[in-house]
């Protein structure tokens, strides 16, 4: 029994030693000598594409430190590159001066084939390659101004040109009508002023005529202005007449008396 126990212990010890040696060999195989690791960069010059860098990928295909073959076989390396659509580019060129505007829109479609190739080589794993293609559409709207033969013409939209032209034509026609046809409706000032002047002249004439009438038909200095007022010459003539009549009558009476006697 002791012999059997001793043999069993011997086999167990030998087995454990073998397993430990195998583990050391595996660990030695899994941990390589320090080799130079390089980084793989996938970059594209077209704008809008994201460049991806995989720093964990070694150059000689050996896994990084601290990993075993079984762990590496269970993990899979997947590199995905997202392609982004580029924005629209609007280019405007403008020059000053007497120019004519011309607008044109150009659409350019450029297919972008393989943006990146990511290759990973591992022991016991398959090679994986991903190719992505994106289509970039660049829309360029260009506004150019060309020199015009006439330096004073400003180029604008057709609608504004037509409206401005029609307005100028209407203005010209109205100006011509006003210049050719005289105004038939007189203003109030042209009526009122002559009337006022005529009234002033008439009043002046009336006053002058009345003054002349008074001067011409003025009474004579012999005629009494009032009933009681008489000039001295008239009084004297009346006295003389009365004296003559009285003397004549007295002479007749005396002659008659003489004849009776």
Swiss-Prot record:
Region feature Disordered, mapped onto this chain: 21-135, 221-240
Protein modification: Highly O-glycosylated. Sialic acid-rich glycoprotein.
A cellular component annotation (GO) from this entry: membrane
Residues bearing attached sugar chains per UniProt: 28, 101, 119, 127, 131
Signal peptide: 1-20
First-listed, main subcellular location of the protein, grouped into a coarse class: membrane
Transmembrane feature ranges: 191-211
A molecular function GO annotation: carbohydrate binding
Pfam families xref list: Endomucin (PF07010)
Bias kind Polar residues: ranges: 28-43, 65-135
GO terms for biological process, alphabetical: angiogenesis; cell-cell adhesion; hematopoietic stem cell homeostasis; regulation of cell adhesion
SS bonds (residue pairs): none
Annotated localization: Membrane
Keyword RNA-binding belongs to the record: no
Membrane topology: Single-pass type I membrane protein
Residues with PTM Phosphoserine: 237
Superkingdom per UniProt: Eukaryota
Record keyword Phosphoprotein present: yes
Side of membrane Extracellular, spans: 21-190
Residues exposed to the Cytoplasmic side: 212-261
Role noted for this protein: Endothelial sialomucin, also called endomucin or mucin-like sialoglycoprotein, which interferes with the assembly of focal adhesion complexes and inhibits interaction between cells and the extracellular matrix.
Name of this chain's protein: Endomucin
The species this protein was found in: Mus musculus
